[in-house]
């Protein structure tokens, strides 16, 4: 797993969307091999099909491709599919691994014509490597500086025509010059429960799990719209079914297994519920700053803000305001409490008791 904010929580939570130990080998076996097998993201699939087919008809390489979206939605799988559809080799690396321009130059020099270079977390690439990448993307060449000081010379090196596929969970963190060099950008959205159920049934077949349709729906509804989480929960439910039952995953077995792992019917885990409880019971529903809220639940502010909060906002449990986080009416109801009359009704960023004209004020604590 990449060293992102989140600490030990990411390692223990079954509903963390980040890649954790134990996911890698199994995820590889579950990945779809072509666009036809890829479930969900219909608009992205259609767009990519046109881009790739057009390039093959012209006999050239397609434009560089940027895939953006939250973790666990299939960006790496899509990069592998792009290479497979083109009949090309895939070279994989990540932004944090490219610390120096020389790291990138070494990788580019080993490419052959038509290769697909996949850079995960491309928003974290070091600036010297990024600047070298500009020229490689546009002109398929790089300038390697030899020596130091006044005697340094720049040697141009040709790079075989290739397609760069970049993946990012934070497209806003990309510099403008880098973003502009991608000819096609696709944003991957969260999945519908029905799509996740299809993914679960497919994964169950590959893993040899006897999964009933109702059980698949139960797991899908708790997977936060994320295939990685769905497949992880499937493995945990499989363990429960094999150890405490006859190995067949029914709806009742799935419900009992997910209760053991503290994943409720909305997909909330221990930390999510702790944040909601603190916000409502300790701070009267807010507003409260994220740092104060993190202290109340015994976690780092980055964990609350980057790991926990996005799903709670999307689920309509928390609203972000200029004065802090506010519990919505849905959060009060989720905790079995009666919401106050002035409770916020949505999880988007809202203004509380302020005029409409200030709705788009960029301030955010």
From Swiss-Prot:
Name listed for the protein in its UniProt record: Holliday junction branch migration complex subunit RuvB
EC number: 3.6.4.-
Domain remarks in the Swiss-Prot or TrEMBL record: Has 3 domains, the large (RuvB-L) and small ATPase (RuvB-S) domains and the C-terminal head (RuvB-H) domain. The head domain binds DNA, while the ATPase domains jointly bind ATP, ADP or are empty depending on the state of the subunit in the translocation cycle. During a single DNA translocation step the structure of each domain remains the same, but their relative positions change.
Classification via CDD domains: AAA
Family the entry assigns: Belongs to the RuvB family.
GO biological process, one term: DNA recombination
Top-rank taxon: Bacteria
Major place of residence: cytoplasm
Keyword Transport on entry: no
Primary role: The RuvA-RuvB-RuvC complex processes Holliday junction (HJ) DNA during genetic recombination and DNA repair, while the RuvA-RuvB complex plays an important role in the rescue of blocked DNA replication forks via replication fork reversal (RFR). RuvA specifically binds to HJ cruciform DNA, conferring on it an open structure. The RuvB hexamer acts as an ATP-dependent pump, pulling dsDNA into and through the RuvAB complex. RuvB forms 2 homohexamers on either side of HJ DNA bound by 1 or 2 RuvA tetramers; 4 subunits per hexamer contact DNA at a time.
A GO term for molecular function: four-way junction DNA binding
Biological source species: Rhodococcus jostii (strain RHA1)
Enzyme class: hydrolase
Annotated Gene3D superfamilies: 1.10.8.60, P-loop containing nucleotide triphosphate hydrolases, Winged helix-like DNA-binding domain superfamily/Winged helix DNA-binding domain
Renumbered residue ranges of the record's region Head domain (RuvB-H): 265-365
Gene: ruvB
GO CC entries: cytoplasm; Holliday junction resolvase complex
Localization annotation: Cytoplasm
Assembly, per entry: Homohexamer. Forms an RuvA(8)-RuvB(12)-Holliday junction (HJ) complex. HJ DNA is sandwiched between 2 RuvA tetramers; dsDNA enters through RuvA and exits via RuvB. An RuvB hexamer assembles on each DNA strand where it exits the tetramer. Each RuvB hexamer is contacted by two RuvA subunits (via domain III) on 2 adjacent RuvB subunits; this complex drives branch migration. In the full resolvosome a probable DNA-RuvA(4)-RuvB(12)-RuvC(2) complex forms which resolves the HJ.
Keywords: ATP-binding, Cytoplasm, DNA damage, DNA recombination, DNA repair, DNA-binding, Hydrolase, Nucleotide-binding
Region (Large ATPase domain (RuvB-L)): 1-191
Binding annotation for DNA: 320, 325
Binding sites annotated in the UniProt record for Mg(2+): 76
Binding residues annotated for ATP, in chain numbering: 30-31, 72, 75-77, 138-140, 181, 191, 228
A family per Pfam: RuvB_N
Chain spans, region Small ATPAse domain (RuvB-S): 192-262
Reaction catalysis annotation: ATP + H2O = ADP + phosphate + H(+)
């Amino acid at each position: 797993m990449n060293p992102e904010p989140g600490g030990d929580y990411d390692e223990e939570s079954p509903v963390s969307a980040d890649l954790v130990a134990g996911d890698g080998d199994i995820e590889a076996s579950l990945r779809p091999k072509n666009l036809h097998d890829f479930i969900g993201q219909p608009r992205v699939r259609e767009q990519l099909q046109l881009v790739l087919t057009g390039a093959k008809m012209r006999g050239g390489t397609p434009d560089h491709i940027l895939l953006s979206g939250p973790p666990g939605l299939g960006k790496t799988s899509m990069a592998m599919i792009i290479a497979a559809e083109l009949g090309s080799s895939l070279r994989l690396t990540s932004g944090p691994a490219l610390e120096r321009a020389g790291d990138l130059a070494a990788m580019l020099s080993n490419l052959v014509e038509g290769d697909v270079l996949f850079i995960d977390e491309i928003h974290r690439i070091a600036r010297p490597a990024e600047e070298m990448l500009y020229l490689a993307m546009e002109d398929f060449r790089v300038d390697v500086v030899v020596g130091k000081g006044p005697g340094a010379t720049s040697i141009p090196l040709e790079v075989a025509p290739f397609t760069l596929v970049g993946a990012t969970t934070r497209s806003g963190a990309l510099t403008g010059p880098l973003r502009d060099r991608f000819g096609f950008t696709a944003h991957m959205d969260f999945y519908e429960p029905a799509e996740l159920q299809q993914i679960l049934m497919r994964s169950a077949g590959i893993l040899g799990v006897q999964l009933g349709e109702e059980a698949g729906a139960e797991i899908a509804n708790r997977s936060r719209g994320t295939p990685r989480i769905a497949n992880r929960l499937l493995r945990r439910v499989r363990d429960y079914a094999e150890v405490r039952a006859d190995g067949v995953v029914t709806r009742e077995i799935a419900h009992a297994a997910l209760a053991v792992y503290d994943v409720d019917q909305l997909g909330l885990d221990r930390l999510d519920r702790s944040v909601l409880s603190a916000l409502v019971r300790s701070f009267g529903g807010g507003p409260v700053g994220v740092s104060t809220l993190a202290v109340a639940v015994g976690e780092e502010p980055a964990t609350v803000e980057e790991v926990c909060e996005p799903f709670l906002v999307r689920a309509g449990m928390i609203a972000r305001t200029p004065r802090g986080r506010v519990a919505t009416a849905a959060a009060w109801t989720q905790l079995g409490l009666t919401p106050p009359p002035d409770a916020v009704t949505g999880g988007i960023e809202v203004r509380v008791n302020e005029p409409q004209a200030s709705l788009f004020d960029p301030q955010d604590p």
